[in-house]
Swiss-Prot record:
This is 6,7-dimethyl-8-ribityllumazine synthase. The lineage of its organism: Bacteria, Bacillati, Bacillota, Bacilli, Lactobacillales. One of its GO terms (biological process) is riboflavin biosynthetic process. Pathway: Cofactor biosynthesis; riboflavin biosynthesis; riboflavin from 2-hydroxy-3-oxobutyl phosphate and 5-amino-6-(D-ribitylamino)uracil: step 1/2. The gene is ribH. Gene3D superfamilies: Lumazine/riboflavin synthase (3.40.50.960). It comes from the Bacteria.
């Protein structure tokens, strides 16, 4: 029996990060967490590119653009969608998650889902570096592991 498992080894892997500007006060913390994780695991600044997009809905398009460039070993998608009083939240969350999954499956590279989908601002704050940790950090660690796993399986 063969068991494949990714390790937290980075080598020369290149990472693209797509960050939504809407809810920037939360997303900047997610980005800081992602950058912290990558750097702690030996990724150099020249191995990281960051693209800012207007909102979460635009994340999949730029993730696809990055993935199709063949420059990146993984794409990290960061954003925050907070429930409001209309159904807009449900549509945005659904389309962003589908779009990110679509990019990953069609590009054959890890496209990591670091988009917070919360009921309120307090939950978003908790998940961007306080009580519930920093999801940006967690997603970046997952990206490192997935890059290594993909390399082992090729």
């Amino acid at each position: 029996m063969t068991v494949f498992e990714g390790n937290l080894t980075t080598g020369n892997a290149k990472y693209g990060i797509v960050v939504a500007r809407f809810n920037e006060f939360i997303n900047a913390k997610l980005l800081a967490g992602a950058l912290d994780a990558l750097k702690r695991h030996g990724v150099q600044e020249e191995q990281i590119d960051i693209a800012w997009v207007p909102g979460a809905f635009e994340i999949p398009l730029i993730a696809q653009k990055m993935a199709s460039s063949d420059k990146y070993d993984a794409i990290i998608c960061l954003g925050t969608v907070i429930r409001g009083s209309t159904s807009h939240y449900d549509f945005v969350c659904s389309e962003v998650s589908k779009g990110i999954a679509h990019v990953s499956l069609n590009s054959n590279i890890p496209v990591m889902f670091g988009v917070l989908t919360t009921e309120n601002i307090e939950q978003a704050i908790e998940r961007s570096g306080t009580k519930a940790g920093n999801k940006g950090f967690e997603v970046a660690v997952g990206a490192i592991e997935m890059v290594d796993l993909m390399a082992k399986m090729s």
